[in-house]
Amino acid sequence: MYGAGAIGGSLGALLSAAGEQVALIARGAHLEAMRANGLLLQRPEGESRHAIDVFGAPREVDWRDGDVVVLAMKTQDTVDALRSLPPGVPVVTLQNGVANERMALRLFDEVYPVCVMFPTSHLEPGVVVAHSSPTPGILDIGRYPSGVEGQAEAIAAAFRAAGFRSEPRADIMRWKYTKLLMNLGNAVEALCPPSEQRQEIVVKLREEARAVLDRAGIEFAGEEENRAYRADAISVKEIAGQPRTGSSSWQSLARGTGTIEADYLNGEVVLLGRLYGIPTKWNEHARRLANKAAHQKAAPGSLTTEEWLSSLDLVG
């Protein structure tokens, strides 16, 4: 598991508890905390501590035939991560956005995209939180660019054994584009406090994106189909002392990481807009403001929606 934060750490703990042999690759204070005390997973049912092998880099791992690497870092870190892996290893992209798979396929033959519906958080070294119960999430998988060949079924079976809903899908990228639409609000939801006006901005971001995807001929699920897909599996519940925080972008600001995923979420829409000649000023504005906040290490909710909108017309 390359990246042991909210998603990677939670999945690694659940896979380990289900009997899979798991190793985590992490860094910084989180790495040191896990080396000292293991990984603490908090869920609505209670908490559990997991003694999992943890490493600071792929070169420290004793790679063996049959190993699979699961990428669980933010997309801005993917290229460096891929270059550090041994040749020929199957790569599972447990990540938001739709850019990671193309990056991975340039270097690796077997690439397995996962559409991640897994509400988690990670704000404290050595601790990850999974908020949905009894099913922790949905992790459908496929083979990139399409199909379910290779190890997709075996990986889905491992996810199911760990409690997830997971099935191989030949159209997995259709679902990853659907998830991309959901994630377009991450930036403004991280930057601005909750309000009706904030939700109106999210609607604009998604409307703009749907127009671009339609022009590009890229398929995605409609809102009703997407709601039905998630409804019977994702059930976020309270955890004592651990209120549900925000998205992965919100958590990046809260931890002061200095980076954020907006270039590969809102920026994906901007890229397609430029390729197909469609203006995307709402998503470009979200991308710029998110990067500015991350670089300045601004706190979540530090921008009002009035400030967000007042600078929108400055986007060329």
Model regions: which residues?
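NAD(P)+-binding Rossmann beta1-loop-alpha1 motif at the extreme N-terminus of oxidoreductases
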Residues: M1-E47
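Anion (oxyanion) recognition and catalysis
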Residues: S16, L105, R160, D214, ...
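Short phosphate-binding/catalytic loops that engage adenosine nucleotides
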Residues: E20, L39, V89, D109, ...
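Rossmann-like NAD(P)(H) cofactor-binding subdomain of soluble oxidoreductases
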Residues: G46-V128
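Rossmann-fold dinucleotide-binding core
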Residues: N96-T178, G185
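Active-site-proximal catalytic alpha-helix in oxidoreductases
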Residues: M173-V212, K237-G241, T245
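NAD(P)-dependent Rossmann-like dehydrogenase/reductase catalytic/cofactor-binding core
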Residues: V203-G316
